[in-house]
Design a protein with these regions (language model features):
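PRPP-associated nucleotide enzymes
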Residues: 1-174
């Protein structure tokens, strides 16, 4: 049986993403004064964004990843938990967390508390997207502010699909 493909509307084009990666990297470089950074990508959604972003950074970077989950195997919501942690120490290092989207802010707050417990010298957050409805979570670097949409592409998925899209899109209403 063949699944119906959902109609995806372009929200942010591939060209706009490329331009914003360059300007965002400049903002990060200026704010961090070119310090060596440990760039921590939040899996799985941020891997494409992180890959593009670090190629624009001009200071030395090392990369690491972590993964959290807020759903069980059946897709039911549950308490946040760490599924995969950093593989290197970050004590006394400048850390930049790279997240795909800030929606409610609860995941990012969980990540921030977890990483601060490891005693970094500094901790800054960079999110590709922040929903305009989310006002409480501090994010130092934001790629784009968007409306409350379900976004796919550029590493973000819906049931494991659409990560490969070179742009950010949203599901069009029928």
């Amino acid at each position: 049986m063949r699944r119906k493909s959902k109609k995806i509307k372009v929200l942010i084009s591939e060209v706009s993403l490329r331009k914003r990666m360059a300007s965002l990297a400049k903002e990060i470089h200026q704010a961090t004064r070119g310090q060596d950074l440990v760039v921590v990508g939040v899996l799985k959604g941020a891997f494409v964004f992180m890959s593009d972003l670090i190629r624009h950074l001009t200071q030395p970077v090392t990369c690491d990843f972590l993964r959290i989950s807020s759903y069980d195997a059946r897709g039911k919501p549950r308490q946040l938990r760490l599924e995969f942690d950093l593989t290197q120490p970050i004590a006394n290092k400048h850390v930049l967390v790279v997240e795909d989207i800030v929606d409610t802010g609860s995941s990012l707050q969980f990540i921030r508390e977890h990483l601060l417990s490891k005693k970094p010298k500094s901790l800054k957050i960079c999110a590709l997207l922040k929903k305009e409805t989310e006002k409480m979570t501090p994010v130092e670097f934001i790629g784009f502010t968007i409306k409350n949409l379900y976004v796919v592409g550029y590493g973000m998925d819906l049931n494991g699909q659409y990560r490969h899209l070179p742009y950010l899109g949203y599901l069009a209403p029928k």
